[in-house]
From Swiss-Prot:
The lineage of its organism: Bacteria, Pseudomonadati, Aquificota, Aquificia, Aquificales. To R.prowazekii RP382. The keyword Transmembrane helix applies. It is a multi-pass membrane protein. Keywords: Cell membrane, Membrane, Transmembrane, Transmembrane helix. The chain crosses the membrane at residues 3-23, 42-62, 72-92, 102-122, 145-165, 183-203, 212-232, 244-264, 276-296, 308-328, 333-353. InterPro entries: Cyt_c_oxase-like_su1_sf. It comes from the Bacteria. This is Uncharacterized protein aq_155. It is found in: Cell membrane. It comes from Aquifex aeolicus (strain VF5). GO terms for cellular component: plasma membrane. The keyword Transcription regulation does not apply.
């Protein structure tokens, strides 16, 4: 329960930072905070909820599915690292930098926290690595997919470590941290892809054929990034092309195929958890479509991001309720609990629709009205499921 407890704690603190983000931008209240504190709170929100929180939940799944006891010695660095990350955000230390993959605060406390947290991730990946290698080919589908997350979690800190030693420190701080976290950050996205597919399989609660040749795509690109970090400038055209193809092929093909398979299987015998699966897959397919449509940098990038994140979050929320019931903390899901995943989708939808950018405001308004009407009808039937 160590990692599950860290998941709950980090999500709660990440949510508190989200509240601080809103207050720090509110006229009349923003003056209560130091200048640019908004960015510290934003870093705290993303790093606590979407990095620490999702990783803690994933490692909890490793222990649960691979049936291994937790080890406090390998958990402690991650716990201490999280407190240092959250503390440096809360107290506004250093300079907050809104770079990709690991939003950063330029301060020794933050760097120490990030290092300790990823050390905890690395130590746990070492504990599960023998089982991951064994189950990649011969295990069931869930264990095979989780094995890819173990392998990639082993590679990611090593990629960051190599990047630290061979990334030149120039005058442009933003470019330095972009290069530092580029390949390792993309490996992290492969971890998230493996987590997402695992969520779908767990919510489906039915056997799915193990397509190990697709699972191979989830590890081939991170292995390539590990070696590319040694020889390539991550921000070169070759480095960016490599990571773009990783998204399109390495993540896109396995997630879309498994998403469609679980979607078809889920609609036969819908219940609350399978309805969440349908919602999660639908969101992901929408986000993936926007991702494939992106050319350069436009406002579809945040729309793609929020939609994909929503697909992960609704699955995590549903599984959290499932496990809380199994642990005896909840007897039955009420209407409020059932509405929480749906409300998460609504928030991310409005963030995405505000960012999608290419359509006229009139068209966006009509689309929003139609989707709101459809989702209201779906919610009424959703809340009635046992």
């Amino acid at each position: 329960m160590l990692w599950f407890s860290l998941f709950i704690l980090s999500i709660a603190i990440g949510g508190s930072f989200a509240l601080l983000v809103a207050i720090a931008r509110t006229p009349g209240l923003a003056d209560l905070f130091p200048p640019k504190y908004f960015y510290h709170a934003l870093v705290g929100h993303v790093d606590s909820a979407l990095i620490v929180g999702l990783y803690a939940f994933l490692i909890f799944l490793w222990h649960r599915i691979f049936e291994k006891k937790e080890n406090f010695a390998s958990f402690l660095p991650a716990l201490l690292g999280f407190f240092m990350i959250a503390g440096s955000s809360l107290f506004g230390l250093g300079q907050a930098l809104w770079n990709n993959y690991v939003p950063t605060i330029i301060h020794p406390v933050f760097f120490g926290g990030v290092s300790l947290f990823f050390l905890g991730v690395f130590l746990n990946s070492l504990r599960f690595l023998p089982q991951a290698v064994k189950n990649f080919y011969i295990g069931d589908t869930l264990k095979s997919i989780l094995s890819t997350t173990v392998i990639n979690s082993f590679l990611m800190p090593l990629t960051y470590l190599i990047a630290y030693f061979n990334t030149p420190k120039g005058e442009n701080v933003y470019e330095y941290f972009e290069a530092l976290f580029w390949f390792g950050g993309h490996t992290h996205q492969f971890v998230n892809a493996g987590l997402l597919i695992s969520l779908w399989l767990l919510l489906l609660r039915r056997e799915v054929l193990n397509l190990w040749f697709l699972n191979l795509l989830l590890v081939v690109f991170p292995i390539t990034y590990f070696f590319a970090q040694i020889f390539l400038n991550p921000l070169s055209s070759t480095g960016k092309s490599l990571t773009t193809w990783g998204y399109m092929v390495g993540i896109g093909i396995p997630t879309i195929v498994y998403g469609l398979i679980t979607l078809v299987r889920a609609v036969k015998g819908l219940d609350f958890y399978r309805s969440i699966l349908v919602l999660s897959v639908s969101l992901y397919l929408l986000g993936a479509l926007m991702g494939y449509m992106i050319v350069g940098m436009d406002t579809r990038v945040p729309a793609h991001y929020h939609t994909v994140i929503a697909s992960i979050l609704v699955g995590v929320i549903a599984l959290t309720f499932m496990y809380l019931q199994e642990l005896g903390y909840m007897e039955k899901l009420g209407k409020f609990e059932k509405f929480i995943p749906f409300s998460t989708v609504l928030v991310c939808f409005f963030l995405s629709s505000d960012s999608s950018g290419r359509e006229s405001l009139e068209l966006q308004g009509k689309l929003r009205e139609r989707i709101t009407y459809k989702t209201q009808r779906f919610t009424y039937s959703w809340l009635s499921w046992d």
